[in-house]
Amino acid sequence: MFASLLLAALPLLTHAALTYRGADISSLLLLEDEGYSYKNLNGQTQALETILADAGINSIRQRVWVNPSDGSYDLDYNLELAKRVKAAGMSLYLDLHLSDTWADPSDQTTPSGWSTTDLGTLKWQLYNYTLEVCNTFAENDIDIEIISIGNEIRAGLLWPLGETSSYSNIGALLHSGAWGVKDSNLATTPKIMIHLDDGWSWDQQNYFYETVLATGELLSTDFDYFGVSYYPFYSASATLASLKTSLANLQSTYDKPVVVVETNWPVSCPNPAYAFPSDLSSIPFSVAGQQEFLEKLAAVVEATTDGLGVYYWEPAWIGNAGLGSSCADNLMVDYTTDEVYESIETLGEL
């Protein structure tokens, strides 16, 4: 009888939990300074990190800027947020932008005071910066699970020296940044990640890694994880099928785990700038759609050898619901009530 009951229950066990079920909540302290707070699914006001941890989310991504003009996302800001993440029992993923402001495929501006003319000087500055960041967290007894050397660097990093006109320079910079992490005082060395945009495009992913590794400046042993962004609203070509192929090829070609480190799905998108991918076109723009998208995305990651996790980008950024896209609202929070959506729990159960 027990055996038959057990067998009957087995179909409900659709997949094992991903290693990383994460969210980027970098904006939290700024939002709290503006007076915002959050409510759980029972309508009770709680700290956002508590709501996320209670939902099963186990890792938090934080962006780090070098010398921001107003202190936003600098090292002190991130220490304050990381202490709360640690207290909530979640792991920490630091996303080093290596800039004083946003770094992405269209802008990789070198921090103020760092060299833009001498590669040797810039390598040394980058090494000392990643070393300092890690040692500061070590001094505060905060472990770092993952650290990425740059953010969406398919077009290079630390421009102009790290532009794609010289993949040798890109490789040398990544090597220096990685070794600042490896030489730090952290008791456990973080997993070092390289993060590119357009994770669905195997051609773009492979071109970057094949080219930069061929220079001999970046060694395969310098880093541990591939990180990719996957946003379905920026290209009709960003199908789940393409992502599945890209992740599988990345892992099999270079023998490293893969993580989807940025993604979104809208609850409202009346005027998308681009057609949505064909194999996602049936998913509604709603909370239920967020849930369905996350489950399908998780299935792709889980089906990939060494596919480790999914991070949702800025699910609670009230006041910026479009999150830079042409969609009206990609949040997992109802910004009219400050209450989280059920999709938060879906993310925590992936």
UniProtKB/Swiss-Prot annotation:
InterPro entries: Glyco_hydro_53, Glycoside_hydrolase_SF
PTM annotation, UniProt: Glycosylated.
Keywords: Glycoprotein, Glycosidase, Hydrolase, Signal
Reported temperature dependence: Optimum temperature is 40-65 degrees Celsius.
Catalytic reaction equation(s): The enzyme specifically hydrolyzes (1->4)-beta-D-galactosidic linkages in type I arabinogalactans
Gene Ontology molecular function, alphabetical: arabinogalactan endo-1,4-beta-galactosidase activity; glucosidase activity
Keyword Lyase in annotation: no
Active site, per annotation: E152 (proton donor), E262 (nucleophile)
Signal peptide as annotated in the record: 1-16
Stated family: Belongs to the glycosyl hydrolase 53 family.
Protein name, per record: Arabinogalactan endo-beta-1,4-galactanase
